[in-house]
Regions:
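Active-site HxH/HxHxD metal-binding segment of metal-dependent hydrolases
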Residues: 1-104
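Soluble, non-transmembrane catalytic domains of enzymes that act on hydrophobic metabolites at membranes
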Residues: 9, 17-24, 110-111, 159-166, ...
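Short, solvent-exposed coil/turn elements at secondary-structure transition points
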Residues: 10, 39, 107-109, 127, ...
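Short, solvent-exposed polar/charged micro-motifs at secondary-structure junctions
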Residues: 11, 113-114, 195-196
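Short secondary-structure boundary/capping segments
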Residues: 24-25, 111-113, 133, 176
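Metallo-beta-lactamase
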Residues: 96-99, 117-197, 201, 206
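A conserved mid-domain beta-alpha-beta active-site/ligand-binding segment of alpha/beta enzyme cores
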Residues: 102-106, 110-115
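C-terminal regulatory/interaction regions
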Residues: 208-211
Length: 211
């Protein structure tokens, strides 16, 4: 863990950031946490988290499909309530490591080098405004946060639990057109693999009755 230089947060939700402080305590004092620039307002307490849609039709099925991955309660022992997308929690949680945070400013670019190996940052808003992914052109891998979720059969689907369904669909279409991806690591669920195009195994929102 002492060799970890960066911790990359795909978006500012508690299930993705709630354990970062615990991990940081085991890393070097030089380790930085990377967020998309859109998350700065949340972290500094100047902006509320974007409201989420489809709690019942989007979130509940995901919990049902993935709850068995929780090995013990320590896996959900979050260090603060930062990242809960409900107004009632807006003043109840601040990150305990704000001095270790850096921001990725894409400046309108589709891809941006961020300093580690062949990985590039890719803006993927839709699930949240600050959602950002990692893409490796050499290995054709994509770490996509909660834009895409995986199923037990190796397929995937666009996440209906989101801030903006249309934006998520548009973002997915752009990624499919521009990137060559054979392996997708979703925020929840099984890894999605295909020898030619892993996006072909992802069900768009319109095919799930999302529109």
């Amino acid at each position: 863990l002492e060799d970890i230089r960066f911790i990359f947060a795909t978006h500012f939700h508690i299930d993705h950031i709630g354990g970062i402080g615990t991990l940081l305590n085991k890393c070097s004092s030089e380790t930085r946490v990377l967020f998309d620039l859109h998350a700065k307002g949340y972290i500094e307490g100047q902006e509320n988290l974007a409201p989420m849609k489809n709690w019942l039709s989007g979130l509940v099925p995901t919990i049902r499909e993935n709850y068995t991955r929780i090995g013990n309660l320590s896996h959900i022992a979050f260090e603060s309530l930062a990242g809960v997308p409900l107004p009632v929690f807006k003043d109840n949680g601040r990150l305990p490591y704000t001095d270790r945070v850096s921001y990725i400013d894409m400046q309108g670019a589709l891809l941006s080098r961020i300093g580690f190996s062949d990985w590039e940052a890719v803006p993927t808003p839709g699930h949240t405004p600050d959602s950002i992914s990692l893409y490796n052109e050499k290995t054709q891998e994509l770490i996509c946060g909660d834009l895409i979720l995986g199923r037990h059969d190796g397929t995937g689907y666009l996440n209906r639990f989101c801030w903006d369904e249309d934006l998520a669909s548009d973002c997915f279409a752009i990624l499919n057109d521009v990137l060559c991806v054979r392996t997708i690591y979703p925020g929840h669920g099984e890894v999605i693999r295909d020898n030619v195009n892993a996006f072909a195994k992802v069900i768009p929102l319109e095919e799930k009755g999302g529109k």
